[in-house]
C-alpha cells in the first residue's frame, strides 16, 4: 500500500476552461507532429503573469496556491511552450488538478458582463480595509 507524503494536494483555481485546446504549426498534419501537453493550471499561470501582467504573488493568490508552487507551474508551462514553438510541436491543452473559480467577484474572475457562463450579476470584490 502506497502512502502519499506531505500535505494533500489542493485543486488549483482557474478562471475558465479555454475555448481552444489544440495549437499546431500550420501546414503540417497533426498526425505527423509530436505534442506537448499543457495543463489547464499551466495555461492559467501563463494567462495571469504573461498576458494580464499580474505579479507572481497576486497570481498565486488568484489560483489559491503558494508562490513556490505557482513558480513551479509557471516555469513548467514556459518550458513546454518554448519547446513546442522551437521544435515545431503541437500544444495540447487539457487535464490537470483544478477547479473553476466561483464567478461572484468581477475583480477575481475578470469576466464581468462578458461571462461565457451567462452570469450577469458579478459583484466587485470588497477588500477588508474598505
From Swiss-Prot:
Family listed: Belongs to the UPF0251 family.
Question: What InterPro entries does this protein's entry cite?
Answer: UPF0251
- Supply the Pfam families for this chain: DUF134
The protein's matches in HAMAP family, at most eight in alphabetical order, are given as: UPF0251
Name this protein carries in UniProt: UPF0251 protein MmarC5_0986
- According to the lineage, what is the superkingdom? Archaea
In the record, what lineage is assigned to the organism producing the protein? Archaea, Methanobacteriati, Methanobacteriota, Methanomada group, Methanococci
Amino acid at each position: 500500500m502506497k502512502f502519499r507524503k506531505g500535505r494533500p494536494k489542493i485543486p488549483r483555481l482557474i478562471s475558465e476552461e479555454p475555448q481552444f485546446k489544440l495549437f499546431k504549426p500550420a501546414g503540417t498534419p497533426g498526425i505527423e507532429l509530436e505534442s506537448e501537453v499543457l495543463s489547464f493550471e499551466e495555461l492559467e499561470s501563463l494567462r495571469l503573469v504573461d498576458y494580464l501582467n499580474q505579479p507572481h504573488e497576486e497570481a498565486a493568490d488568484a489560483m489559491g496556491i503558494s508562490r513556490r508552487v505557482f513558480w513551479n507551474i509557471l516555469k513548467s508551462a514556459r518550458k513546454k511552450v518554448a519547446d513546442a514553438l522551437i521544435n515545431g510541436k503541437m500544444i495540447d491543452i487539457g487535464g490537470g488538478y483544478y477547479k473553476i473559480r466561483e464567478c461572484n467577484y468581477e475583480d477575481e474572475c475578470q469576466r464581468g458582463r462578458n461571462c461565457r457562463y451567462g452570469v450577469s450579476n458579478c459583484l466587485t470584490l470588497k477588500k477588508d480595509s474598505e
